[in-house]
Each structure stands twice: as C-alpha cells, then as structure tokens.
A protein has these predicted regions:
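Cytosol/matrix-facing ends of alpha-helical transmembrane segments
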Residues: 98, 321-328, 377-382
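Membrane-interface helix/helix-cap signal primarily in integral membrane proteins
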Residues: 2-153
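Alpha-helical transmembrane segments
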Residues: 2-5, 263, 292-293, 319-323, ...
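C-terminal regulatory/interaction regions
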Residues: 4-17, 31-34, 333-394
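Divalent metal-coordination and catalytic microenvironments
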Residues: 69, 131, 158, 199, ...
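Hydrophobic alpha-helical segments of integral membrane proteins
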Residues: 105-120, 124-127, 131, 135, ...
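Hydrophobic alpha-helical transmembrane segments in multi-pass membrane proteins
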Residues: 144-307, 365-394
Length: 394
C-alpha cells in the first residue's frame, strides 16, 4: 500500500505544466458543487471557485467547456487543503474566469437523476441523493448535523451499504438460478452499473471488488480459493490502476484502514468466550476508537455520545439507504421518512454535547495512531501464538 501511495504521488507530478498567465482552456467538468468546480484538461485538473466565475449557462457534470482566465499554481495552506488537491489531482487554480462555450451531452443519466431529485422538494433532494448517490449541493441541511454527531461516516455510501445491497439483490434474484442463470453474475452487473452513478465510488468499489474476489476461484491456488487479505490487496491495485489519485482520498484511507483493522480484530474478538452481541459491541467500540483521529480530522467536532450514537444510528442509516434505493418511485413516502429522520437528527444535535476541536490533526498524527494500533495487534497476536506453541510443545 505504501508503494502504491508513493507511485500515486509520483504520477501526480508527471503532468503537462503551464506558466502563470492568461489562458484559454478546453476540458470537461469532473467535479461540480455550489462553491467550486474542477475542469479536467490534458491530465491536469483545474480548480475554479464559482464566486469567481462569470457564466450565464447552468453547468452540469460532464459538460465540455471552453474557459478563459488567469492560471495560477496551487498554494497549499494546510494538510486538509493538500489532501483535497491530491485526491482530486488538482494542479492549478483559475481566477477571473469567463466561460466562453458550453457543450452539453445529448443524454445524461446523472442529469436525469438530479432533475428527478430536485423536482420533489429540498428535503427529498438533500437526503435521497446523499443516501443513494453520495452527492449533495449544500452541507447545511444534513451534513452539518451528522458532523456534530460524529456520524458523518455512517450516512455516506460505504462498503457495508454495498455488502448489504449485494445480498439483498442476490436474494431477490435467487429464482434465476432455477432457469440456469447465475444470480450472482446478474447481481454483480446491476451493482457495477450503480457504482458508475456514485459521486465518490472509492469505498463502494472496494467492497464490490472484495465481493467479486470472494465469489471467484483463484486459478493460482491449489484449492482454487483466495486468501484472507487477497480481496483487499486486489482492490487497492485496481483502484490504483483506475485512478491513482483515489489513494489520496479520505474515503480510501478511512475505508481501507477500517476494513484492514476489522479483519485483524475479528479473530481476536471471536476467540473470547462472550455472546455475539457483546462481541459485536466490543468490535464496534474498538473500530470507533481506531477512527477517532480520522473522524476529528473530518468533523472538527467531538461529540461525547459519538460512540453510542454510532452504534444506534448505523442500522438506522442502513435501513434508510435500502428504503431510498427500493422505493425511489415513491418520493412522498420517502419525504415523510426523511422528515422523521431530519427531526431525529435535529433533537440529537440539540440534546447531545459537541465540542469544537481546535487541535490541528495532521497526517503524521494519523500515521502514528494507525502504526500504534497495528503494532499493538501484531504483538498481541505474537504473544498468543507463542503461548499456543508452548502448549503444543509441552
């Protein structure tokens, strides 16, 4: 993983470079929000703040544009800005920007989804698009609430969402097996198409690849099975090959580090003589503690009830995610559900205490914290193995 991170950083520097000045640039819109957009041009991504943009034509993802403005090399003020630039592969900031021409695609599924969502009110649009596709226009309605509750990682599309979705689709398609059509292949095809519609597919793609590996045969193994960590390693390699800058995204780091830690901890927790509920509770607590620095890096708030809220809200968000997918054709019902969820989040924010953290969390703190956990787990496993070896040789 360290090698792929280094290669990603190296490749991000092998670009076509421009000197500071006024340029006309052609490219496509790869990222779009209310505050900024990103233009892809000759393997360079160019950031434009919408407050600095002169344009009368509504813009959409995928639009081909010709723009003119003052091109400036990026300036990095802090680690969060650096992370944003790296994960989006941004090399330049364009100021005093004028859009000269806009060419829209003849048909866009994402545009149809956007219009459908916006046509059913602000509440539906804010929750439905966020829960189903991980996209949003404003943080005000939803994300600010979950940030203060330390549960923002639960509402966005994650690997767990995809695992549940895969098994649900597999259950629905099970009758296909009777007519000699492999239901799992149809399920993988449907989920792959869904993947292409996500605003940030990193975590979901990780889960998808791991499921594919889990349900495939390994031609290089004597028993045709992949080893425990093969799926995780293959997913890292695939993401690197698809887009090397994925490896700098917070989604990648949070998803892969959490998954790897869970895979290390599960055998240790399972070995304890406890019931399944307590084992699950212990595992969730350990993962929450492991992710504390990353959550503070993302949220800037510390909620004293964050662990309890995470345990309670995780299954609730899973339920809302599946309902949003299955009942997309009933915006009235979903709007009513979102109204209840929004009120629940409002009261949780009002009656739980969140402290704003002024400590600057940088990548060295995250690396040190992760290393401490992994070394601790390694020595605990080593101690356990030595104990087992002594018993066997006694």
């Amino acid at each position: 993983m360290l090698l792929t991170l280094y290669l990603s950083y190296f490749l991000s520097k092998t670009k076509i470079y421009y000197e500071k000045g006024i340029y006309k640039i052609e490219g496509s819109i790869s990222v779009l929000s209310k505050k900024y957009l990103v233009i892809s041009n000759e393997n360079n991504n160019i950031l434009i703040y919408t407050s600095d943009l002169k344009n009368s034509t509504p813009l959409s993802l995928g639009d081909q544009v010709e723009i003119q403005g003052e091109l400036n090399p990026i300036e990095i003020d802090n680690s969060k800005i650096a992370t944003f630039y790296l994960q989006n592969n941004i090399n330049y900031l364009l100021k005093k920007t004028v859009i000269l021409t806009v060419i829209k695609p003849e048909f866009s599924v994402k545009e149809k989804i956007m219009n459908y969502s916006k046509n059913h009110g602000e509440l539906f649009d804010s929750y439905w698009r966020l829960l189903v596709f991980g996209s949003y226009d404003s943080k005000e309605l939803v994300l600010n609430k979950v940030n203060r509750l330390n549960i923002v990682h639960l509402i966005v599309i994650s690997g767990l969402h995809f695992d549940l979705l895969f098994y649900l689709i597999l259950l629905i398609l099970k009758p296909l097996d009777k007519i000699k059509i492999k239901s799992k292949y149809v399920a993988f095809a449907l989920i792959f198409y869904y993947l292409t519609l996500l605003a940030n597919p990193v975590s979901a793609l990780r889960a998808y690849i791991m499921q594919v590996v889990k349900n495939s045969n390994n031609p290089f193994s004597y028993n045709n099975k992949f080893k425990k960590y093969d799926g995780l390693l293959i997913s890292i390699l695939v993401l690197f090959l698809l887009k090397n800058n994925y490896l700098f995204s917070l989604s990648f780091i949070l998803s892969f580090s959490s998954t790897f830690t869970i895979m290390l901890l599960v055998p240790m927790v399972k070995s304890k003589k406890l019931n399944n509920f307590l084992k699950t509770l212990i595992l969730m607590t350990l993962i929450y503690l492991f992710n504390i620095p990353m959550l503070l890096y993302i949220n800037e708030y510390w909620n004293y009830f964050g662990l309890l809220l995470g345990i309670i809200m995780a299954p609730l968000f899973q339920f809302f995610h599946l309902c949003s997918l299955l009942f997309w054709w009933s915006p009235t019902m979903l709007s009513w559900m979102y109204y209840l969820l929004d009120n629940l989040l409002y009261y949780l924010v009002e009656y739980t205490f969140a402290l704003k953290i002024n400590i600057s969390i940088n990548w060295w703190i995250l690396i040190f914290w992760s290393s401490f956990w992994y070394l601790t787990i390694f020595f605990m496993k080593l101690k356990s193995n030595i104990k087992i070896w002594k018993i066997k040789t006694a």
